[in-house]
Regions:
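Conserved AWS/pre-SET-to-SET junction and N-terminal core of the SET lysine methyltransferase domain
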Residues: 78, 286-298
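Conserved hydrophobic/aromatic pocket- or pore-lining residues that grip, position, or stack substrates
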Residues: 136, 231, 268, 287, ...
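Charged, cofactor-coupling segments
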Residues: 4, 22, 122-124, 128-165, ...
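Single conserved hydrophobic/aromatic residue that forms the stacking wall/gate
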Residues: 1-8, 12-13
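Extended, domain-scale alpha-helical bundle/helix-rich regions
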Residues: 14-127, 131-135, 142-144, 167, ...
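Extended boundary segments
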Residues: 247-279, 353-385
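Beta-rich nucleic-acid/ligand-interaction surfaces
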Residues: 115-119, 394-399
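Long, charged, glycine-rich C-terminal linkers/tails
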Residues: 281-290, 389-393
Length: 514
């Protein structure tokens, strides 16, 4: 008998559930192409208590024979070196050097964001994420890209060939791996390689499989100077779009127009898509009014959404991917009268945001250590947020990536060139949700007899609402940071705005006192 169960999003809950419902000596069926090796191992640990086993099967192919949509096959293209900083050949050289250090001669790259970075490969197979469904097998003298070759243009195929990359069909990857006759030590990351691929590698006697974390993750986590320069520029254009969005929002509300949470995404798309080099939203816009914002990843729908009123807060978390960078920004806008608690929550959230943004630390500090800096202003009031403070952002890719982050579990040491979001918040269920988010760039601040000091600088330039701030709460240093930030916002955005827009921005960026 094969016991089946729904796989939930929480790994530990899912694994315990499967272990609970499986009968003694039972079998759990799953598709090895859609389950990572790490997932299967985690499940097996829970099944061991009942002497249960896992059986790989693909019931979808057997049962869904009619009307099944094909896999996504959007046009695949290469991000130009002028945006990426390095060619695929140069990145392959970097990877091979790292593999040699790890005692490996080959790697199967199965994680789409790592593969995209390695080969500068982009497509639109995943909503809001410019990646192609593919695998890449890298050896000392060759790289083979498994992809639906029909969607790779002749120009892109020629460029890949020039960079030492051969094309093969996506569906041939398992056959290819099983047929490898040359002895290789293959790096396979259990977290990112699916179980069917991992088993195929293990079953080939010519291949020795070595479990290692994917070295591409830290390589792409530190942005090169070209990537940094372009993403800074992308954020300025994104800031222009955000300014125009807020102006329209304020004008339409002032005119008494009835707006809903759904209206927000429409306005944002209008202004972002008008910007040069726009590709797509980087994720589905979160526009949450009033109590809805207390649900951290709330999404309005046609069936369930709120109307905006002239009171309370509107939280807008949004972003875009351009040819030269990916953005992620949250602003919480006051729409009218606020309660004293709402104003205090907003001010304390802003303190958290500022304190991590202006932090200075020694170069051994990791995301876990820095996370406490952001939370301390809220902890003083016995408040906490049940999520991370920030996450890494890809360059022209997915809005969440690793290896670094600001949260209570991350142990990756921060390095110059890393980008991370700064997004503390207060979430009072059924009452209000507040979040303020910028992207920050880590840079080297100073060297002295005590060591190497690092710091952050913002790369998001959009005014932060100052009217909700409770007087006397922000310190002089925090006020100085906020005023300096707004001066920089105005300096960067004003030259790209109309005269009326500049006047509006000048008011939003006006210095405030204690």
């Amino acid at each position: 008998e094969i016991a089946s169960c729904l796989v939930g999003s929480e790994m530990c809950i899912r694994d315990r559930y499967c272990g609970k419902v499986l009968p003694e000596g039972g079998k759990l069926g799953l598709c090895g192409l859609t389950a990572s090796c790490g997932l299967v191992r985690s499940l097996q640990k829970e099944l061991d208590a009942k002497k249960g086993t896992i059986k790989l099967l693909n019931l979808e192919d057997e049962l869904w024979t009619e009307g099944r949509p094909a896999l996504p096959a959007t046009p695949a293209w290469l991000l130009p070196k002028e945006y990426a900083g390095f060619s695929p050949a140069e990145k392959l050289g970097q990877l091979r050097a790292k593999l040699s250090e790890l005692g490996c001669t080959a790697q199967l790259v199965g994680k789409l964001d790592n593969l995209a970075w390695l080969l500068n490969l982009r497509a639109m197979d995943i909503q809001c994420t410019p990646y192609a469904m593919a695998y890449c097998y890298v050896t000392p003298d060759k790289a083979t890209l498994f992809i639906d070759t029909a969607r790779v243009s002749a120009e892109a195929a020629a460029e890949l060939k020039e960079n030492g990359v051969e094309l093969a069909e996506y569906g041939d990857v398992l056959t290819f791996l099983a047929a490898q006759a040359e002895e290789q030590t293959v790096l396979a990351d259990p977290v990112s390689v699916n179980y069917a691929v991992y088993q195929t590698l293990q079953a080939n006697p010519a291949l020795t499989v070595k479990d290692e974390a994917d070295p591409l993750l830290p390589m792409k986590g530190v942005k090169n100077e070209v990537e940094l320069a372009h993403t800074r520029e992308a954020h300025i254009r994104d800031g222009v779009a955000m300014v125009r969005f807020q102006i329209e929002l304020e004008n339409r509300l002032a005119a008494g127009e009835e707006l809903t949470e759904l209206t927000i995404d429409e306005i944002l798309h209008k202004y972002r898509s008008a910007q040069d080099k726009f590709l797509t939203e980087s994720f589905g816009t979160i526009a949450a009014y009033g109590p809805n914002a207390a649900m951290m990843h709330y999404h309005a729908t046609e069936e369930d959404h709120a109307k905006l009123e002239k009171k309370g807060f509107l939280l807008v978390d949004s972003g875009a991917t351009y040819m030269d960078g990916t953005t992620d920004i949250t602003r919480t806008y006051p729409l009218g009268e606020l309660t004293e608690d709402e104003r205090l929550f907003y001010t304390w959230t802003l303190q958290c945001h500022i304190d991590i943004a202006r932090a200075v630390w020694l170069d051994y500090c990791d995301g876990h250590m820095l996370d406490t800096i952001a939370r301390e202003p809220l902890w003083r009031h016995l408040i906490n947020y049940r999520c991370g403070t920030g996450h890494s952002v890809s360059h022209v890719g997915n809005v969440h990536e690793g290896p670094h982050a600001l949260n209570g579990r991350n142990t990756t040491v921060f390095k110059p060139g890393m980008i991370v979001t700064d997004e503390p918040g207060v979430y009072e269920g059924g009452v209000v949700g507040i979040r303020i988010e910028n992207e920050l760039e880590c840079y080297h601040k100073a060297s002295n007899q005590y060591g190497e000091f690092l710091a952050f600088c913002p790369i998001t330039f959009v005014p932060i609402a100052t009217s909700p701030i409770v007087p006397g709460v922000l310190s002089r240093d925090e006020l100085d940071w906020l005023n300096a930030y707004h001066r920089e916002v105005f300096e960067k955005l004003a030259p790209r705005l109309t005269e009326d827009e500049r006047d509006w921005l000048a008011k939003k960026c006006a210095a405030i006192g204690a």
